[in-house]
């Protein structure tokens, strides 16, 4: 059974000292939607815009076309092309259960959507249910992006919010520990479930695969700490940033569970 979700738009952090909270952005999304739903986007105005047929546009076109040659078996691509001041950096991170052809399909959708929503912007980011795509004229490899962040949460509340909140944080914290443990195959992604009486709680955490495991843990710990603000007692919720994200529901929401 699906539940409707309302994204709460969070203002981008203009600097580490100030956080401005913008007007809430309301949008209904079906949680159990098997399609690759658009979630949110942000066009960065600080980096300016490029002109049609400019070197920057040429480098961007080269990168996006070249990315389609990838097999997406890792579900992650970070690349750059061109010389300053027209260097373009691009990153694609697909959800942990959406590698291969699903990831490639999400790239195609995200590329066209970002260009439509942020026309000629040198920098921007777009989130879909199954991937994140980011472009920028400056390098951001291995760096936490906490300037781009938003919440999504269920409109329904559980009967015992206090206990549910404790269990939710415990599950997400456990998944974070597993996702960031040292191993030969560091995916920075983990899913799991927890029995809550007659129902189950399902969770997922993920970081961009260019982050060090310690940086990933820092990122996840930070957004999990926002549970009270985003999802207090809600049946489902998500916090998504430009570097990491988590999601929990009271029903399975992934194609596969690790």
UniProtKB/Swiss-Prot annotation:
Family the entry assigns: Belongs to the cysteine-rich repeat secretory protein family.
Protein name: Putative cysteine-rich repeat secretory protein 61
Keyword Magnesium part of the UniProt annotation: no
Domain of life: Eukaryota
Main location (coarse class): secreted
InterPro entries: CRR_secretory_protein, GNK2, GNK2_sf
Gnk2-homologous domain location: 38-140, 146-253
Higher taxonomy: Eukaryota, Viridiplantae, Streptophyta, Embryophyta, Tracheophyta
Keyword line: Repeat, Secreted, Signal
PANTHER family xrefs: CYSTEINE-RICH REPEAT SECRETORY PROTEIN 38-RELATED, CYSTEINE-RICH REPEAT SECRETORY PROTEIN 61-RELATED
GO cellular component: extracellular region
Localization of this protein: Secreted
């Amino acid at each position: 059974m699906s539940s409707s979700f309302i994204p709460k738009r969070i203002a981008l952090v203009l600097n580490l000292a100030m956080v401005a909270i913008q007007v809430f952005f309301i949008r209904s999304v079906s949680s159990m939607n098997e399609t690759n739903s658009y979630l949110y986007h942000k066009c960065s105005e600080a980096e300016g815009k490029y002109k049609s047929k400019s070197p920057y546009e040429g480098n961007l076109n080269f990168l996006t076309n070249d990315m389609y040659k990838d097999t997406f078996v890792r579900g992650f691509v970070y690349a750059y092309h061109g010389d300053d001041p027209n260097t373009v950096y691009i990153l694609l991170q697909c959800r942990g259960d959406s590698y291969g052809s699903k990831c490639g399909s999400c790239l195609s959708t995200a590329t066209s959507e970002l260009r439509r929503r942020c026309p000629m912007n040198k920098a921007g980011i777009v989130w879909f249910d199954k991937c994140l795509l980011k472009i920028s004229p400056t390098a951001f490899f291995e760096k936490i992006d906490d300037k781009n962040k938003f919440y999504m949460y269920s409109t329904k509340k559980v009967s015992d919010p206090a206990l549910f909140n404790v269990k939710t944080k415990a599950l997400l914290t456990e998944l974070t520990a597993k996702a960031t443990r040292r191993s030969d195959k560091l995916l920075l992604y983990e899913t799991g479930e927890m029995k809550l009486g007659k129902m189950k709680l399902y969770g997922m955490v993920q970081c961009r695969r260019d982050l060090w495991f310690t940086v990933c843990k820092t990122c996840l710990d930070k957004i999990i700490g926002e549970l009270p603000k985003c999802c207090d007692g809600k049946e489902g919720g998500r916090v998504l940033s430009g570097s990491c994200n988590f999601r929990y529901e009271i029903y399975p929401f992934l194609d596969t569970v690790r």
